[in-house]
């Protein structure tokens, strides 16, 4: 089950960095502002921040992804997923490296729940399977909040067409052979409300967090992460976003 923080309605922004697409959801959790970034690297690589330790209640600077997933279609109704769980100080602790933890990180729940339990407390599995084995686009009513879905579909169609034309698929590396820098993360800053529109305020904080990442993306990986963490801490202390 998701933490209570996930129930908070956030301010969403989308960013494109080559074949890397980022959905930034910024939520207020009491006196904290939680910036969570879901990442998609086309065509089929996804990751976000922590799965179990993420609730927006504790300060965190550039916490990293706790799961990394590749999903490959088999046919129009089935797909195969290859997923890695990543444990560490900046993600989920190693105590979740169990069979139950593996099931929960992938499906949002343990797999042996009864039908009644799934109906009372639905998880990721019910959200996905409830749509059926294939998405019927004609029956959809897309909203502004579905911008990420629309971007993804548009870019996938473009990539498929380019591949059919014999063009080399684009790669996420900045330089051939270098480690791919990713952006999926959780950042939690202590920023109490101020005397103006809090929705606009927290959105500006999310934008400021992303700008720090983008400004430093050409640095070597270790240097980049350390610099991002320092910049986030400095920004929180200064109160300037």
What are the language-model segments listed below?
Residues 1-241:
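C-terminal catalytic domain of Rieske-type non-heme iron oxygenases
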């Amino acid at each position: 089950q998701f933490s209570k923080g996930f129930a908070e309605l956030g301010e969403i922004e989308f960013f494109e960095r080559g074949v890397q697409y980022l959905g930034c959801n910024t939520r207020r959790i009491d006196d904290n502002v939680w910036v969570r970034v879901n990442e998609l690297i086309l065509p089929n690589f996804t990751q976000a921040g922590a799965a179990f330790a993420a609730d927006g209640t504790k300060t965190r600077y550039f916490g990293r992804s706790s799961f990394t997933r590749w999903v490959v279609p088999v046919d129009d109704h089935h797909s195969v997923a290859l997923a890695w769980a990543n444990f560490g100080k900046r993600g989920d602790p190693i105590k979740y490296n169990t069979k139950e933890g593996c099931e929960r990180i992938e499906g949002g729940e343990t797999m042996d729940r009864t039908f009644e339990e799934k109906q009372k407390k639905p998880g990721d599995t019910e959200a996905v399977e409830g749509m059926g084995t294939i998405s019927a686009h004609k029956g959809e009513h897309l909203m502004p909040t579905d911008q990420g879905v629309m971007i993804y579909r548009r870019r996938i169609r473009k990539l498929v067409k380019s591949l059919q034309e014999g063009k080399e698929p684009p790669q996420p590396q900045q330089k051939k052979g270098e480690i791919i820098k990713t952006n999926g993360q959780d950042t939690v800053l202590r920023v109490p409300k101020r005397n103006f529109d809090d929705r606009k305020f927290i959105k500006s904080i999310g934008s400021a967090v992303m700008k720090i990442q983008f400004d430093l993306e050409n640095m070597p990986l270790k240097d980049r992460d350390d610099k991002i963490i320092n910049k986030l801490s400095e920004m929180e202390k200064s109160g300037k976003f």
